Amino acid sequence: MKIMGIDASSTATGWSVFDGNNLIGYGIIKPDGSDWRDRLVHQGPYLAQVIQKYKPDKIYMEDVPLKKGNAKALVILGAVQGFIYGITASFEIPVEFLLPSEWRSPLGLYDGTREGTKRAELKHKSILKANEIFGLNLVWVSPSSKKNEDDISDAILIAYSQIKKKRFGRPKSQ
């Protein structure tokens, strides 16, 4: 069974594909444009190409976590999620949305400390974990660097967390 992991945003969407336990593809889509709506429209064809190439049976995508703060970011992430969901629906591929804690916790990315829950720390740990498990050389420069490859590592680990749980195909427990 082929499964795909997606870590979506309006600036960079990471993706990964596994065939069984084997990581067979991964990458990032970084669309051009200053407006998030334009970037979103430009992401679509690239994501469709990846789906057509790998033909995943199921997709796991990070859900938008509801938290206090930036309402605009929630609106944008919700739009990104809906847009990508529409693309996957056109291929009739089932999608399951996972909250960050649902895929990070089983992989040991939370260490129980307040420091360990900071975004930059979690992104850095994601890169280290993906590099360790899959023998990759994904890059982490600094918390604010645009050269960080955490979108790719997150997409890989989103899918991998479900392989580890052997959940693909089974309904999510409530």
State what each model feature region is.
Residues M1-Q174:
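Phosphate- and other anionic-substrate recognition elements at nucleic-acid/protein interfaces
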